[in-house]
Amino acid sequence: RHDIQKNADGSWTANGHMPLEDLVQYVPLPLDEKREYHTIAGLLMEYLQRIPQPGEEVQVGDYLLKTLQIENHRVQKVQLIPLRDEEELDFEV
């Protein structure tokens, strides 16, 4: 999928419009079943209650979500940075 790619440092870079249902197949983020948002951009805006600025970071579960690129008030690119080594993260559902 071109919506997300793994970086050499173990982080991920994803499109802001990537559906969260697809994202969690790569990155184990905790999602609220009652959420009103369906994309990474929506998740960031829900946490911040506004449009994020480039470079702004939000912690979600064991990941730091860093806004990389904004165009026309839309989140285009987000970096997902694991806060712990992947070996420590439990991927079992």
Model feature map: region roles:
Residues 1-93:
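Cytosolic regulatory modules rich in charged/polar residues
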